[in-house]
A protein has these predicted regions:
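Fe(II)/2-oxoglutarate oxygenase catalytic core
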Residues: 2-246, 250-278
């Protein structure tokens, strides 16, 4: 075993991993230990990591193929690294609503590795929600109802042309013509690696249940969002330069708080491809 330390966070999920330098090539045994921790907890954090873009990519590629984000600005010279930025003169941040990344894709992303490059003096935290717990704390009747349901996820209303979000973020978000895809996924999934059941909808990209109208879907989606985001189901992470959050998109939501007017927040994000959900 390695000498890494794994400390739980104060919230409903996630651990901080210490005594590891991700700028170095990880041994197979150390990587296996980190991977097992990630699968078990669904959310891992690192501190004080001085990573170049190449270091960031080297770590990410240990986990699988890299998704090239078609909407976000890229780090110069690195198409596989998305830039998540909010400058002092900008009002709207990226990711400022509960969501999980790429649920609008036919094969959603496995995970996202976010590295803090510049953080505000105060604020800019990220909230995470535990989708295992969201499922487990539903009533038996609700579980039975949702087990056979599927939902439609879309990027059109967020990244598409003439949407308020895309227009307000035009310097950071592009290619609205690519926001044409929808995807149908089960509402309850079995995680392909942990084998635990999780609720798989989110308020940003899930638009309706299959066979239901938007109007019929909204009350149930709203209820599930309220249920999921109860305080006892969430974790809050405070960033500093060199912090990394790596979340499993199949069992988490996240929400970037926009509470730092007049300051810069700059992150580099790499997204790892996943597999079909069932």
């Amino acid at each position: 075993m390695s000498n890494i330390l794994i400390n739980p966070t104060s919230g409903s999920m996630g651990v901080e991993i210490h005594n590891v330098d991700l700028s170095n090539e990880l041994s197979d045994s150390l990587f296996s230990e980190i991977r097992e921790t990630f699968i078990e907890h669904g959310l891992i954090f690192f501190r004080d990591q001085e990573l170049t873009p190449d270091d960031h990519l080297s770590f990410a590629k240990r986990w699988g193929e890299i998704n090239i984000n078609r909407f976000f600005a890229k780090v110069e010279g690195y198409d596989q690294i998305a830039e998540v930025r909010k400058d002092p003169d900008q009002k709207i941040n990226i990711g400022g609503a509960w969501h999980t990344d790429h649920s609008y894709d036919q094969i959603p992303a496995m995970g996202s590795i976010l590295l803090a490059k510049e953080t505000p003096k105060i604020g800019g935290d990220t909230l995470f929600a535990n989708m295992y717990k969201a499922y487990e704390t539903l009533s038996n009747g609700m579980k039975k109802t949702l087990e056979t349901m599927k939902a439609c996820h879309s990027s059109r209303h967020v990244f598409g042309a003439h949407t308020g979000y895309a227009e307000a973020s035009s310097q950071r978000i592009s290619n609205p013509e690519l926001a044409t895809q929808d995807a149908i996924h089960p509402v309850i999934i079995t995680h392909p690696e942990s084998k635990r059941k999780a609720l798989y909808i989110n308020p940003e990209f899930t638009v309706n249940f299959e066979g239901w109208t938007l109007e019929e879907s909204k009350p149930l989606l709203d209820y599930l969002t309220e249920h999921t985001t109860q305080q006892e189901n969430t974790t809050r992470f405070q960033w500093e330069p060199g912090s990394i959050a790596f979340w499993d998109n199949r069992c988490t939501w996240h929400f970037a708080l926009n509470d730092y007017p007049g300051e810069t927040r700059l992150m580099h994000r790499i997204t790892v491809e996943g597999s079909a959900l069932s």
